[in-house]
From Swiss-Prot:
Purpose: Transpeptidase that anchors surface proteins to the cell wall. Recognizes and modifies its substrate by proteolytic cleavage of a C-terminal sorting signal. Following cleavage, a covalent intermediate is formed via a thioester bond between the sortase and its substrate, which is then transferred and covalently attached to the cell wall. This sortase recognizes a Leu-Pro-x-Thr-Gly (LPXTG) motif, which is cleaved by the sortase between the threonine and glycine residues. Involved in pathogenesis. May regulate the rate of synthesis and/or the stability of a subset of LPXTG proteins.
SUPFAM superfamilies: Sortase
Any GO molecular function: cysteine-type peptidase activity
Name of the protein in question: Sortase A
Organism: Listeria monocytogenes serovar 1/2a (strain ATCC BAA-679 / EGD-e)
Alphabetic keyword roster: Cell membrane, Hydrolase, Membrane, Protease, Thiol protease, Transmembrane, Transmembrane helix
Active-site residues, record numbering mapped to chain: 127, 188
Extracellular domain ranges by topology: 29-222
Activity regulation description: Activity is enhanced by Zn(2+) and strongly enhanced by Ca(2+). Inhibited by chalcone, a precursor of several flavonoids, which blocks the SrtA active site.
Membrane topology annotation: Single-pass type II membrane protein
Sequence intervals crossing the membrane: 8-28
């Protein structure tokens, strides 16, 4: 009886080890895809932007099964401050105020407490998963000239990618504010442990009022 119980336990552990990457990816895909910006109002976004946020860069780790399960329970829907779309690489994510493990599993995260869409430098961080179609994995394929769209449900901000580069993780000056209006997208250069970061920088080309037509075009429901 004891041997049979042990065999069952070993089998269960083995199955969990085999299927845990698929389970983990499934949870992250659900977290980052089941909600869209259309579920929010401009007044919600404005209220969320006024709240304090944490920027706990040092605590951020590679997504593990444990962190994904915790993140699924703890990510803050009241931290949503907008949405980002990069049509050329099929990125469409919510933007969360504050960088922490839970928010990074649900979308892109802001990196400074004072950043404002359409003004100065607007840096965003995102995870690079083993399934490179998820979160900021596709950003690795961004090229000069590609368009990046941001919205706070009041305006649509259109940026054009002007530069892509790989930097060391210590080069934190890329998130500093600037006089020119730009967006800076940052992710790890590979889905495993690394000290390098891939960066895509875009210049603000146009700001216009967000209409329902524009929202449906760039931020469609999933």
């Amino acid at each position: 009886m004891l041997k049979k119980t042990i065999a069952i336990i070993i089998l269960i552990i083995g199955l969990l080890l085999i299927f845990s990457p698929f389970i983990k990816n499934g949870i992250v895909k659900y977290m980052s895809g089941h909600e869209t910006i259309e579920q929010y109002k401009a007044s919600d976004i404005k209220k969320n932007n006024e709240k304090d946020a944490t920027f706990d860069f040092e605590s951020v780790q590679l997504p593990s099964m444990t962190s994904v399960i915790k993140g699924a329970a703890n990510y803050d829907k009241d931290a949503v401050v907008g949405s980002i779309a990069v049509p050329s690489v099929d990125v469409n994510l919510l933007v969360f105020k504050g960088t922490n493990t839970a928010n990074l599993l649900a979308g892109a995260t802001t990196m400074r407490s004072d950043q404002v869409m359409g003004k100065g430098n607007y840096p965003l961080a995102g995870h690079h998963m083993r399934d490179e179609s998820m979160l900021f994995g596709p950003i690795m394929k961004v090229k000069k000239g590609d368009k990046i769209y941001l919205t706070d449900l009041e305006n649509l901000y259109e940026y054009t990618v002007t530069e892509t580069k790989t930097i060391d993780e210590t080069e934190v000056s890329v998130i500093d504010n600037t006089k020119d209006a730009r967006i800076t997208l940052i992710t790890c250069d590979k889905p495993t442990e690394t000290t390098k970061r891939f960066v895509a920088v875009g210049e603000l080309e146009k700001t216009e009022k967000l209409t329902k037509e524009l929202e449906n075009k760039y931020f469609p429901s999933k």
